[in-house]
Amino acid sequence: MEFGDGVSFAVVPTVFKREDYKRTKHDTVFSKWQVLIGSNDWEDFKNGKDGVGRYRVQNLPRKSCPGLYELGVAVIGQEQCRKLEPDIVLASYLGQAESVRSRLQRYGRSGAHLRNVNNLNDCETIESPVKAVTGGLFEDIFSKGGSILYRWAPMGSKREAEATEGMLLSTFDYAWNKGSNGERRQLDLLKKLGDREFMSKRKSGISRMLFPFLRNQVGIRIKGEKHVLKEERKLTCDVDEEKSNNFLTSILKLTRSRPQPVSDRFDEVDGSCSDIVCGVLLEDGGCCIRSPVKGRKRCIEHKGQRVCRVSPEKQTPPKSEIFTGQDHHNHKDSDVVCGVILPDMEPCNKRPVPGRKRCEDHKGMRINAFLFLLNQTDREKTVKDEKPDPESHTESIEEEALTRFCEATTKNGLPCTRSSPKGSKRCWQHKEKTSSDTSPVYFQPEAAKNVACGVKLGNGLICERSPVKGRKRCEEHKGMRIT
């Protein structure tokens, strides 16, 4: 600038020391401060402490994109671990990278180019690897109990990040940046980090916390990709919300699993008092109708037991499952019986095993299991022995039609049990066969009333031994088929 006497003066732009200002005009573009390396992370990792890494991977940016980043130092107390205030952070370095996430990872693993600098000896780069370990920038901060923090601002491209970095370096003097700012100021940074009076002045007053426009902001305004930071915050909030929901869910599960008070009293109720009963199946086939203990499903006698079968109505035992062609007046309808049709065409009236439908002799059998073991002669005789009721002639005709069988011999030697259509002796599959084809092959006439094993022997005869109870074959031929 020239004046009247021809004397010119150079206008030197104002350069602010970055660590002296906690609020800047470019704060709106940057993210919040995050811990990159704790004060003891490297030492704990070197000693093999469980669950400790060299740096905080969980605090890195979730997306990899070009941008600016600032490194800062701070002494973090236990009460400040969860929420970091910018008042305690001294910004010390500004950089740019094609991938900010990858650059921060290199800082966390080894300190990158900032670790190989001995700042206590004229800030010169050290060639010896032994001295580099003991005299780096990060180690000096760790010795004072400080931690390394970062914040970043995403940019559209690397060229845009380089241009913005040059603008900020011409406005601020970062203690760790070297070049246009001159030499690194590590000693100055360490002195301010340990100065309690200096750090106390940085804390915001109540008036500035309530009225942000009163805060002293310096520097220049820059542009950045703010939508990337919004997506980052959204992902972080979703993760935090999921963690809090899982924590609340675990608390609710814990409260629900607390034991309920149990009373030793129980009352016997009848069918009209209450619909809630114990329901455990008793040995006599009935169900326990006592009122359960308060807060439980069973009475005091059956606590902890499972229900094999519960009656749908109280004091009403299950209906009997009987397959029979005639009435049985010697049993009540409500009695539970086995119901398997015996060879003499009478149902088994034994009481079933508790929890099952059949008695001990016929367990696992179907109702008409013995019907397949009868030959043609036995079945004809049993059908003829059934005399129809003269008073209900129409019903007897229908029953006779239902009990008419095809009687053709199948490939395995057993008679066909399909019902033949009205006016025909054979079913639809065996209507071409004659009566000679349906003659029994493996039963002797004199053993018509007895159920035999029926397996063909080597000499051409048929085994006529009585089968084992509940099976089709004798003890010697059990599991064999008729060929």
UniProtKB/Swiss-Prot annotation:
Function per UniProt: Transcriptional regulator involved in the regulation of cell differentiation in meristems. Probably regulates the expression of various KNAT genes involved in the maintenance of the cells in an undifferentiated, merismastic state. Plays a role in the regulation of gibberellin 20 oxidase and the gibberellin-regulated protein GASA4. Localizes in the nucleus during the cellular differentiation state and may act via a single strand cutting domain. Transcriptional regulator required for the induction of dormancy during late seed development.
Tissue: Expressed in vascular tissues of stems, hypocotyls, leaves and flowers. Expressed in the vascular bundles of xylem in shoot parenchyma cells. Expressed in the remnant cytoplasm of differentiated fiber cells and in protoxylem element of parenchymal cells.
Gene Ontology process terms (BP): negative regulation of DNA-templated transcription; regulation of seed dormancy process; xylem development
Keyword Nuclease: no
The entry's keywords: Cytoplasm, DNA-binding, Nucleus, Repeat, Transcription, Transcription regulation
Chain residue ranges for the region called Disordered: 380-399
GO molecular function: supercoiled DNA binding
Result of knocking out the encoding gene: Reduced levels of lignin in leaves and stems. Reduced seed germination rate.
Compartments where located: Cytoplasm; Nucleus
Protein name per its UniProtKB record: Protein EFFECTOR OF TRANSCRIPTION 2
Domain GIY-YIG intervals: 64-112
Main subcellular location: cytoplasm
Keyword match Heme: no
InterPro entries named among the record's database cross-references: Effector_transcript
Start-end of each Cx9Cx9RCx2HK repeat: 278-303, 338-363, 406-431, 453-478
Record remark: domains: Contains a bacterial GIY-YIG-like domain which can functionally replace the bacterial GIY-YIG domain in the UVRC protein.
Cellular-component GO terms for this entry: cytoplasm; nucleus
Region forming the signal peptide: none
Organism in which the protein naturally occurs: Arabidopsis thaliana
Bias (Basic and acidic residues): 380-396
